[in-house]
Amino acid sequence: MKNFLIILLFTAFGFSAYSQNKDAVVGEWVNATGEAHVDIVKRNNKYFGKIVWLKNPKDEHGATKTDQKNPNESLKSKPILGLEILKDFVFDGEKWTDGKIYDPKSGKTYSCNITLKSDGDLNIRGYIGLSIIGRSEVWKKVK
């Protein structure tokens, strides 16, 4: 009985730590190039991220950078700053999956998974079709 209670205690502790980890992506992150900060938030048990800082928010003419590469003509005038680029991620117990990432430099949207690395950084994996055919980059938490 004593062993059973100890196992039960460790199991409960494990589930508690596990459930706390699901929001580890929430917060502000700097992308791999250092050109942008993305604030990841949780809404209705899904995770979303928008650009909240740009190293160069203005174009070469001094105008606010807009989403010029967007395939939707009506969105091309939308500012990059404030643009939601991560959408609809769900936590599957190990990583955040089933989401989409939008690349304003190309105007393309990709399937995406996010993994929390052991050092606390995020591994962002964008892909088309299969996850093995894609590109990864590492984002660091803004301190």
PLM feature spans:
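Tryptophan-anchored aromatic micro-motifs
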Residues: D23-A36, I51, D98, K140-K141
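Short, surface-exposed beta-strand-loop junctions and turns on beta-sheet-rich folds
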Residues: K46, K55-P57, P104-K105, L130-I132
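Edge beta-strand at a domain terminus
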Residues: D119-D121, I128-K143
